[in-house]
Structures are given as C-alpha cells and as structure tokens.
Amino acid sequence: MTKGLYIESYGCQMNVYDSLMVEDILRPLGFAAVQRPEDADIIMVNTCHVREKAAEKLYSALGRMRMLRKEGALIVVAGCVAQAEGEAVFERAPFVDVVVGPQSIHTLPELIMKATRDAKQMNVEFPAISKFDVISTDLLVSRGVSAFVSVQEGCDKFCTFCVVPYTRGPEYSRSVEDVLAEVRKLADGGTKEVVLLGQNVNAYHGTYKGNEWDLGRLIRKVAEVEGIERIRYTTSHPRDMHSSLYDAHKHEPKLLPCVHLPVQSGSDSVLRKMNRKHSVQEYMDIIDTLKEARSDIALSSDFIVGFPGETEEDFEATMDLVRHVGFATSYSFKYSPRPGTPGAEYTNQVPEEEKSSRLHRLQHLLLTQQRLFTKSMIGKTVSVLVCGTEGSRSCSNEVFGKSEHMQPVYISVDGDPAGYRNKIFSVKVLEEGARSSLKGIICTDTISLPPPHSM
C-alpha cells in the first residue's frame, strides 16, 4: 500500500533539489508525493535559514502541520534551520518526530524507521560519507523539461552576514562521473535543460579519472550528453570566476547567456566588512570579461542594504554600480542579523527606517533596469524552450516557455499545445507581457538548438 509524503520546501534551488532527492530515497519504502499534508503519512518541512525570521517561520508552519496531520503521521524538520536549531526544535515543537540537516538527508530511511517506534530522531552531523555517495542515480525519476543537478555544496567563504558555512558545511564537489550519470538519466527521461547547482557553484573542483576539473570543463562535458540542449549554473561567487568558465561562455552554445553573480554592495568599505574577498573594481572587471565573452549576456545579482556601518555614501556607491552594470534582474534585501555570524555582533547597526528607505530606492532602480531589458527584446528573435501550458494564461492556443535569458515567454500556437512541449523554437517577440514576460509567435517551423554565437 502506498504511503503519502508531503514536503513543503522553502528557500533556494538547493532545497528544491534536496526535496526531490527525499522523494527518490523514500520511494523504495512505499512513499509517494501527495499534494495535501492531511493526506500524508510523513510531513516534511524543508527549511531555509538565509532570510529574516527563518526560525519563526518554521514554527509557524509546524503549528499548521500539527493541526492538519492525520493520526500516526510523522513530522520531519529538514534543511538549514534544522541544522542550526538542532535539539531546540524538539524543545519548541515537541510533536516533531525527526530533525535532519541538509547533509544528512540520506539517513532519512533509518531515522524514519526508528521514529515509528516512538523514539525521536535527530541527525545534524556533517558525515564523512557524502549523501551523493549513498543516493544512487537509479532512484531518479523524470524531472520534466528542466531539472536541477547539484554539483557542489557548502561554502568556505565565511561572509560575515551569512549562515551557509555553518549550516551546509565546507565546500564539497561531486565527481564528474556522478554528475554525468545523473544528467544522462535525466536526459533519458526527456529533460532538455539542466541547471548545475551549488552554494558556490563556480568553486566546483570535482575529479574525473584522477584529475581535478573546474566548472567550465564540467559544462563542456555535460554539453556532450545526448538530449541536453541547454545548460545553466547558479549561484556563483566573484572570487571563483576563472578563464575556463569565460571560455565556456564564449565557445559553448548550449551554455545559456545568463549569469547570476551576487555582489551584495558597491562599496569597498562594506565589502571588506562583509568579508567578500573582492573589490568593486574586481567585480567590474569580471562583468567586463563576461560581456566580452558573450555580448548578449544577461546579468543578475544579489544586494544587501543597511549592513552595519553602511553610510549614505556607501549606499550611493551601490546605486552607481547598478547604473554602470545594467542588470536584467536582481534580488535585494534589508540586512538582518543572523545568530552565530560575525555581523550579528557588530554594534553600528543601521536604523530600520533607513534600511527600508534605501531598499525602496534600490529596488526602484533595479525594477527600471529590468523593464528596460524586457522592452529591449521586442522585435527580436529568441530561442524558447517550451515547458507546456502550466504557466500560460487561459488561452487554449497558448504555450509557455523560457527564453535563453530565462524570461517567461507566452507563445500563440496552432493546433494542440501539448505537441509543442519540451521542444525549442525560434520565437519572434511581439510585445511585453505582465511581470516582465514576453509574448510572441513561432517564426519558423524548424525546431532549433540554441544558436552558436560569434564575437
């Protein structure tokens, strides 16, 4: 008899990937995903510790799950808040049955079996054996048109605002062989696009036949897998950009022209306090090199405003950087102290009112740039991977896809929309849609691969 598994996942793409991995490893035990917590025999909350009040959001979610769960169902807390809180989860929510950190999710089958015997279980260790060494690609099922593939985890940078090194552990890279095995399995299931994931994905240093490979070299190898037509990677750190990756952007047509490269601040003074280990000029040099490698590249970034000690001059330096680069899209947040990080101990905290004011000004500028980038696509022909009709509007003759710059594209089509799914088309952009999306029509009946570019 099939048992229900309900997972509520918060935060980054890595958590989404981990949640899918949990589905894979529990499937042999008879579990299958369900859409409602009240139908589940296991309810799992996969948490993120990066954003503000992460722990409070967890306990609020747990309160809901407690009310909804059926008799005998287990509640599991996973992810980075589980790693950070540990035993405190049981103290604040004694109805929780299992607490497991992100690097120990491969132990869930054992933890669950023990928990069914009325004994609470916890594993928040950083085990010597990686979860990737335990979880076989044979367990993978089809992930759809686009799929995440984790290639690197953890962080050794220790930015003073960030909890990731403490919750995800040190940097670890999967072997090239393991990555390729997963990509091939996904391609066999119909996946056309893979997104290579890592906390610092461009710090990748996996081995292949005894030799260490970097991310640029891995990308070229992934591009050789039959059926894979698009490759992306996220998230990068400026310190780990290297010539091999630039070359991949210049010469590998399957690597999409989009890079997410967080800078956090445009002030050298703030960057030093953040322990970012790069300067504004070094970041700008990276941007220039990326644009030289691929002239149509779309750039995105992360920004934190109101970091302790940030002055108005520091903030204006961030605004100047944004104006100079011209981002296609970006994410911006007010600084909030994270317990256990050096930034939380700094005394010169910026008043909340000032943080809010700066965030509003920055987001207005970033949104203006995003709109300009969207409008610049009108009249152009873009390569679109059709995902299906799930994201489309109510029109029966419309499909939804993503451009090579990851913009949502709605396409008017003839015939059955289902026949367009999981294929790449050249699309003429006719107009801007809602929320920075595009609308267009297929300009050729020929299904095309992402076109090679020339410099």
UniProtKB/Swiss-Prot annotation:
Cofactor: record remark: Binds 2 [4Fe-4S] clusters. One cluster is coordinated with 3 cysteines and an exchangeable S-adenosyl-L-methionine.
EC number from the UniProt entry: 2.8.4.3
Record GO cellular component, one term: cytosol
Domain Radical SAM core as annotated: residue spans: 141-375
Transmembrane listed as a keyword: no
Domain of life (superkingdom): Bacteria
Broad enzyme group: transferase
Residues that bind [4Fe-4S] cluster 2: C155, C159, C162
Keyword Endoplasmic reticulum: no
Reactions that this protein is recorded to catalyse: N(6)-dimethylallyladenosine(37) in tRNA + (sulfur carrier)-SH + AH2 + 2 S-adenosyl-L-methionine = 2-methylsulfanyl-N(6)-dimethylallyladenosine(37) in tRNA + (sulfur carrier)-H + 5'-deoxyadenosine + L-methionine + A + S-adenosyl-L-homocysteine + 2 H(+)
Location in or out of the cell: Cytoplasm
Binding-site positions, [4Fe-4S] cluster 1: C12, C48, C80
Primary site of residence: cytoplasm
Required cofactor(s): [4Fe-4S] cluster
UniProt cross-references to Pfam families, sorted A to Z: Radical_SAM (PF04055), UPF0004 (PF00919)
GO MF terms held by the record: 4 iron, 4 sulfur cluster binding; metal ion binding; N6-isopentenyladenosine methylthiotransferase activity
InterPro entries given in the database record: Elp3/MiaA/NifB-like_rSAM, Methylthiotransferase, Methylthiotransferase_CS, Methylthiotransferase_N, Methylthiotransferase_N_sf, MiaB_methiolase, rSAM, rSAM_horseshoe
MTTase N-terminal domain: residues covered: 3-117
Keywords per UniProt: 4Fe-4S, Cytoplasm, Iron, Iron-sulfur, Metal-binding, S-adenosyl-L-methionine, Transferase, tRNA processing
Record function comment: Catalyzes the methylthiolation of N6-(dimethylallyl)adenosine (i(6)A), leading to the formation of 2-methylthio-N6-(dimethylallyl)adenosine (ms(2)i(6)A) at position 37 in tRNAs that read codons beginning with uridine.
Subunit structure: Monomer.
Protein name listed in UniProt: tRNA-2-methylthio-N(6)-dimethylallyladenosine synthase
